[in-house]
């Protein structure tokens, strides 16, 4: 969708020399993310595109663009690296894509804390902080390409969540600076619990221009593959390792057969028909970790030392939603779900779902910390047939007590929230009174407007 009646030349004159992209091929590319993982979203979002892309390099330039967009009532969709999976950065109403990738500085690093610009890539932040003994607490499998602003705006957790929980947990985001889209745009600072007003809001509640993020101790992480002959043994190994508080770990990713067969680069380490655990464990914990592997009947088939972490394959790039990416590279009919199972050391519900669905819903678990307990989240691979069948699978999971964060919707509240966040809606009314920021994504705003 574009805005044919707007005088774009006048708009461009109002923002001066800030970089603008008008080439249609580039604009269409920068209007998309990985929405096509979903056969439901693919037809809904395929034709959505911005009118142009603007790339500011500073907060001052963001203010200039904000002023121009408010004056012309132009929709604004904020973009980091476009690595989201359900249309978070796809413009539904045309307008401007505000690409913040040029705002990529690390302003300062202190013990346990860093101040960064939104376009800073996660791996680039670690490159600055790790020599000082610190690292970002968690990151998605798109670690090398994703930006911190995009992760905060559209993500929820990832590698590191087994220790630190999810992004919205108190303490995982310290402060943000935000530019508003009022008649006179201003800069406001949110600290402490106030940050939840923009955390995981798809950029609907202001333009983040700076973030203070807590850091964790930087450990030497070994990457390990452990294989099992039985899936439930692999899943129990994941639970026991997660519950072993004295063992320091960053990633516990469990994959039922045939998922490991989709990992082309890892095939030398994955025997045919095996079930696999892809892991990151601190090197000081390896001795007792190996004893646990032996107790549970696993076989270590691959190990990469922390000293080689930057070389070659990263195991993290086969976990979380990279699992879906690799699987779809071999079978594009596959899609996925996002499910949170209740804490249960016996994993009875997981076993039931594994046996009930068989290969139609292939079990992929990612362990994370929630309310001081280690729980299995799942990004199951689904053999898609019809939208009705997909909905029936979701309904069955929910009826049996699992929580499904539906990845087949671009509406904020219809995915992982399930309820309208009235505080976020009230905040949007203050900072974006015309509803210009990523319009169409927040149900609470749409219902308020009607």
Question: Which positions does each model-derived feature cover?
Answer:
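Conserved glycine-rich FAD pyrophosphate-binding loop
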Residues: 74, 81, 90-95, 101, ...
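FAD-binding subdomain of flavoenzyme oxidoreductases
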Residues: 105-107, 122-123, 127-246
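Short cationic amphipathic helices and targeting signals
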Residues: 51-56, 114, 222-227, 271-289, ...
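N-terminal flexible segment immediately upstream of the FAD-binding catalytic core
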Residues: 1-67, 83-112, 259-267, 307-331, ...
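Short, conserved charged micro-motifs
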Residues: 61-64, 124, 232-237, 284-291, ...
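A conserved active-site cap/scaffold subdomain adjacent to cofactor or substrate pockets
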Residues: 228-230, 243, 247-250, 258-303
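General beta-strand structural signal in soluble alpha/beta enzymes
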Residues: 20-24, 55-56, 76-80, 98-100, ...
